[in-house]
From Swiss-Prot:
Physiological role: Involved in allosteric regulation of aspartate carbamoyltransferase.
Taxonomic source organism: Staphylothermus marinus (strain ATCC 43588 / DSM 3639 / JCM 9404 / F1)
Pfam annotation, one family: PyrI_C
Protein name: Aspartate carbamoyltransferase regulatory chain
Keyword entries, A-Z: Metal-binding, Pyrimidine biosynthesis, Zinc
Entry's Gene Ontology cellular component terms: aspartate carbamoyltransferase complex
Subunit structure: Contains catalytic and regulatory chains.
Cofactor annotation comment: Binds 1 zinc ion per subunit.
Amino acid sequence: MNPTNLSKYPNKLIVSKIRNGIVIDHIPAGKALKVLRVLGITGSEGLRVALVMNVESRKLGRKDIVKIEEKFLSMKELSLIALIAPTATINVIKEYKVVEKQRVEPPSIVKGLIKCPNPTCISRKKNEPIKSLFKLKSTNPIMLECQYCGYVLKGDEIEDYIES
């Protein structure tokens, strides 16, 4: 598609391809900025990022998409994405081609990534060397249970307690 002829494609989404990096697709609508937040991407890193929000999706009705050039994800980052956008798909791009495609899966155990909201939980005590420990209780909706105090974190509440 030639950008000068955009009027010929009124219903097309035009975002340039990336040479190397990732495309995070099938993010629930409105969650792309939260995905960038958990990845620690603010815009000042110098990474080229394309963000598309609330586009039509046969699977989800509406979805968000994030493209990040020259970025690849760690297991920790994949786990965090799975907790806030469990329908997401990660496409790894090398030399403009998709070389790997995977759906994210919430981890069954989440250790040290999320702070327990319960202020009396032992994992919140400053002089305790233990890290928070949550067990996946449900995937739809996502629910995590603290293994120390029993507090249950649900859905959108999770992103508020992600450790930075």
